[in-house]
Amino acid sequence: MSAAKVSKKRKAVTKDVEEEAGVFSGDELNVGDIDGALSDDANDLSSDEEDSEVELVDDFSSDEDEDEEEELDSDEIPSDGEAPLKKKSGTSAADLEVPTNDDESSSEEEQPNFRIEKDANGNDRYIYDEINPDDNSDYSDVEENANTIGNIPLSFYDQYPHIGYDINGKKIMRPATGEALDALLDSIEIPKGFTGLTDPSTGKPLELSQDELELLRKVQMNEIPEEGYNPYEPLMEWFSNKQEIMPLSAAPEPKRRFVPSKHEAKRVMKIVKAIREGRILPYKPPSEEKEEDLELINYDLWADEAERPDHPMHVPAPKLPPPGYEESYHPPPEYLPDNKERKAWQEADPEDREREYLPTDFGSLRKVPGYGEFVKEKFERCLDLYLAPRVRRSKLNIDPESLLPKLPSPEELKPFPSVCATVFRGHKGRVRSLAVDPTGVWLATGGDDGTVRVWELLTGRQLYSVKVGEEDPVNVVRWRPSKDAVVLAAAAGDDIYLIVPPILDPELEQASLDLLDAGWGYAASKPAPKASEEGKKTTPPQWVRPSAALADNGVCAVIPLRYVAKSISWHRRGDYFVTVCPGSSTPASMAIAIHTLSKHLTQYPFSRRIKGGGPPQTAHFHPSKPILFVANQRTVRAYDLSRQLLVKIIQPGARWISSFDIHPTSSTASGGDNLIVGSYDRRLLWHDLELSQRPYKTLRYHRKAIRAVKFHPSGRYPLFADASDDGSLQIFHGSVTGDMLSNASIVPLKVLKGHKITGELGVMDLDWHPREAWCVSAGADGTCRLWM
Amino acid sequence: MNGVQDSTSAAASSQSAQRQVRVQLVSKQEDIALPESTGPILVPTGLRRYALSTLVNNLLGNDKPVPFEFLINGAFLRTSIDEYLTANGISAETTLEIEYIRALIPPLHIASFEHDDWVGSVDVLSATSLATSWASAVVSPGQERILSGSYDGLLRVWNMSSQIVATSPSPADGGHGASIKAAKFISPNSIVSAGLDRTVRLWKYNESDDGFSGKITPQIELYGHKSGINSLAVHAPSNRILSASSDHSIGFWSTKKSDAPAAPENLVPSAASRSSKRRKVSSSVSIPQRGPLALLSSHTAPVSAAIFDTNDSTVGYSTSWDHSLRTWDLVTAALVDTRSTSHSLLSLEHLPEHHLLATGTSARHITLIDPRTSATTISAMTLRGHTNAVVSLSRDPHSSYGLISGSHDGTCRIWDIRATKTDNDGVVGESVYSITRRSLEEQGKADAKRVGGEGVKVFSVCWDRSVGIVSAGEDKRIQINRGEGVLSSA
């Protein structure tokens, strides 16, 4: 170790020496005299700083002295020359330890060139000596003052004052040793730049100059040792956001910036080639990691999956027709739209367009642009799927129109009443009832003012008026149906009045009067009711002659019914009529009365109350058969008068029947009777008695109660009408066919409006002209109207 | 005036200067005919009636412009010529023959004669009326008389100054016992009337010399009908009367006492009769009672009207509510022909020049029926426009094409059977003018529509050449309207 150190030291010394030698050598090469001067200066310095002993040393080291001594001791030097040389070349510190070093180095010579040392772990460690370059080392620049004793220990010169010889053969004097100098050193101040080292090349104590000390300080302070270096120079911003007027470089843009690099292309092609040949795999093939973990059990859900038939709700997408020429990217010219068509297509609303695309000629497929509507269509399709998924509807392929019965249009069913032709004004208060006479010339009306009036039908001229009810309204007026005599029956208050209006020709008037007068004798011939029976309520009333005032006005007979009759209906032959008193106070046995004109006879055919359905409302004779129809609130019953039997019960299903009518030609044209029933609960019901007890058809067209229904009396026009409290009449066409197979067809024809609603009441009664398709209505507003 | 017309025609021509058509203007009337030399004229097709009328006036050199109407192929030009050509598919290169006639001037209201009750019938005695011509009498202008039969049972004779010259006697003195629905002059001195009292009454009418008072005296009572009489027709040269009654029969009567048979006993009011008792008691005069020459009864419903053929008094026509029009041979009282329509017929008028019968129907229109047996179609034309039953018809004295109708809707309408339009029902006539009731206008309700013609129904209308259009109705008045040559004759 010490050897290595020595060698290292030596190297270092050598280096130092070299540096110094360099410095000096350069000078020396140029001016030899200056070298001497320098050394002289050094000597001067040392002499200035040191005392006489130094002078002594100086003396010793003077060139002349050394030369002399070298000559004297030249023989002895080779034996001991190496060590002093080593010491000389080493640092001055090494020089101080020279004696011990010498001992070790001498023992080293017998040892191998390595040592075994213990390292930190206690293991053996071989440490080899450093290899000396020896002979091969080239000391090209041997310094003048360098010791030339060679590779001999310096200890050989221990006996001598010099330590070797320089290149000129002069003795190199041994520098003064520490022991000699210590006393001096201690006695003097340590000057600035004192290092305590000995310059090995000069043997003088190494002193550092001011510059060197400054340099050392900078190194110690981690400063840049270079002189004149300013770490705080002002910053020059070369690249900043400031737009310079003159650019840093005005060079034109180099070509490489915009020309594709051929080099890169070459490189890319190389890679491409390699990829093609398979030398480079563009991506790492996924390594099939088949780590069959035996601990995990995988279940294959679809292992035994088999083809299944489609779900019943599966709806395959509708098949689109194959594309045609128009959809081609290069359609034949005749499919291309001209400018006009193109403009029309563009201007049309997208929804109105006949087709969604415009045939366009692109020339070639590669010129076809991307489909602009793609995203939109996909989006809409998604919306469709979300909002309106495809559903299979079980659709019947039947035109709904064909299911409807074929109703003829009203135009084809003319004539029917459509406009108001005449207004009959004169009644004060409501007109409760009206009737057109069998000849169709006159109209009889009765109203709340207690008068019965007869009008000329066409012109609306009032021909005759009689006030029959003093207080009570005239509830109903009805003409006797046959034409051989003219009799008007009117019900006002508790009485029935039979009137022959004085508007007839003498012959007919006489016939009418005779008809009515004939009964007086018959009634008189009958035994008068006994006094005991007189008081009984069930006794049929006796017909009486009217008062003189009434008789002058054409009233011929009065039937005191004792209860208010609201319905009169004549038998078609004109000899009988039936009256109904629907009042709740009326005894059931007296509600319905049949009056015989020729005998002045009143009979009560029903002794008991009709079961179910409340009090009777109205009654009509069958137009051809001896059957009496009686309606109570909920049912219509047919009684065979000759056999005195209940024939049929008709249940219209209405809550409260207001009126009904029997088809005039029913049962003569066809086998069955047809009935229309109007009810206060707004329903008009058509009954075909052959079909069912229940209504064949229910017509609910009115907003309020239906007051009256009536068939056209002649078989000529298959019309019927109803009158309602909503102030309107409705005209229907209801044809009854002769054969049994087809049912009656009912066509609503016309709503006749005109009557004002007065006190919640609209049209109170209606009647048809016996021949024409004209109809008359009695309104609660005090007018009657003729509709034609 | 002419300058204005020129500018209008210039404006019209500038509008459609691009198309022109060659027209030949002709007229059948001598006084307004263009000179022979006038050849076809090239006119713009944009011209309408007014521009054409101006053109003709200019050609005639009239100082006072006369309005003209123009007929192309027998139909009135109601559009521009261009539209007419387009509508009828006629090339503009053909020469169009356009006939022009004097335009109808809207008839103006002259006077209204107020009555106490509804007026059911009206007739006119004037220099040009039939009764005058039959009697070869002379009625000086200004001395025209108007006869009205009212619903109060009285006949009234009016002069043109709205004064009543004469009134028929009351029922007690041999007058009508009920409303009069028909009244006519037979001659300037005799009147026939009928009504709801089932009698036809002949009256003698005498006038004082000054013409301000007169007297109607009952002449004959004709019994035979069992129900009210709706209309009368007279033919003075043969002394015959036709009556239409609601008892489904037509009475054929003679105006001469000597000709007529005795009255049927059962129809003559007797003391036994209840209703005539009161009347008989107070009756102070005895009037000859006669029966019908014949009762023509084959109608099945009230007969609304019966008329004589204009040319042949032995032929009668009748219409009835039973929808039929019947032709009668009055000599033998035999039914010749029956023409059935689909509606009740309420009035009848003969248009002899066209061999047509015009009948008013309850279905609010007038049907023109060809009564000849050779005619294949029953209805030649329908005139539509009324809104209620048409109950009275009268011919235009000026024109064989003209017609006036009175309806229950409260209007009288003037028709020209050449003014037609093609409907989906075929050729349909349109009314030329509509005369409303003055009474409505006086009430300030001219525009108000009466439901069913309430209060303003027209019952009778008569068109006389010198007096004008006389109509009577439910508003208790006779209304006289006159237009100077209302319809052009042609």
Swiss-Prot record, chain A:
Q: Where in the cell is it found?
A: Nucleus, Nucleolus; Nucleus, Nucleoplasm
Keyword Chloroplast included in the entry's annotation? no
Comp. bias regions, Basic residues: 1-12
Q: Which InterPro entries match?
A: BOP1/Erb1, BOP1_N_dom, WD40/YVTN_repeat-like_dom_sf, WD40_repeat_CS, WD40_repeat_dom_sf, WD40_rpt
Q: Where is the composition biased (Pro residues)?
A: 318-335
What GO terms describe the biological role, i.e. biological process, of this protein? maturation of 5.8S rRNA from tricistronic rRNA transcript (SSU-rRNA, 5.8S rRNA, LSU-rRNA); maturation of LSU-rRNA from tricistronic rRNA transcript (SSU-rRNA, 5.8S rRNA, LSU-rRNA)
Q: Which keywords describe this protein according to UniProt?
A: Nucleus, Repeat, Ribosome biogenesis, rRNA processing, WD repeat
What's any one GO cellular component for it?
Answer: PeBoW complex
Which Gene Ontology MF annotations are present?
Answer: large ribosomal subunit rRNA binding; ribonucleoprotein complex binding
Question: What SMART domains does the annotation carry?
Answer: BOP1NT (SM01035), WD40 (SM00320)
In residue terms, where are the WD repeats? 426-465, 469-509, 611-649, 652-697, 701-742, 758-788
Q: Pfam families from the xrefs?
A: BOP1NT (PF08145), WD40 (PF00400)
Please indicate if the UniProt record lists rRNA processing as a keyword.
yes
- Name the source's superkingdom: Eukaryota
Show the ranges annotated as biased composition (Acidic residues).
41-79, 100-111
Q: Where is this region: Disordered?
A: 1-125, 308-354
- Where do Basic and acidic residues bias regions lie? 115-125, 337-354
On subunit structure and binding partners, the annotation says:
Component of the NOP7 complex, composed of erb1, nop7 and ytm1. The complex is held together by erb1, which interacts with nop7 via its N-terminal domain and with ytm1 via a high-affinity interaction between the seven-bladed beta-propeller domains of the 2 proteins. The NOP7 complex associates with the 66S pre-ribosome.
Function, as annotated = Component of the NOP7 complex, which is required for maturation of the 25S and 5.8S ribosomal RNAs and formation of the 60S ribosome.
Q: Which HAMAP family match?
A: BOP1 (MF_03027)
Q: Which family does it belong to?
A: Belongs to the WD repeat BOP1/ERB1 family.
Q: What is this protein called?
A: Ribosome biogenesis protein erb1
Q: Lineage in the entry?
A: Eukaryota, Fungi, Dikarya, Ascomycota, Pezizomycotina
UniProtKB/Swiss-Prot annotation, chain B:
- UniProtKB keywords: Nucleus, Repeat, Ribosome biogenesis, rRNA processing, WD repeat
Q: Which GO terms describe its molecular function?
A: ribonucleoprotein complex binding
Q: Which GO terms describe its cellular component?
A: nucleoplasm; PeBoW complex; preribosome, large subunit precursor
**Entry-linked Gene3D superfamilies:** YVTN repeat-like/Quinoprotein amine dehydrogenase
Annotated region described as Disordered, given as residue ranges: 257-285
Q: Which family does it belong to?
A: Belongs to the WD repeat WDR12/YTM1 family.
Q: What is the name listed in the Swiss-Prot or TrEMBL entry for this protein?
A: Ribosome biogenesis protein ytm1
Native organism is Aspergillus niger (strain ATCC MYA-4892 / CBS 513.88 / FGSC A1513)
Phylogenetic lineage = Eukaryota, Fungi, Dikarya, Ascomycota, Pezizomycotina
Q: Which gene encodes it?
A: ytm1
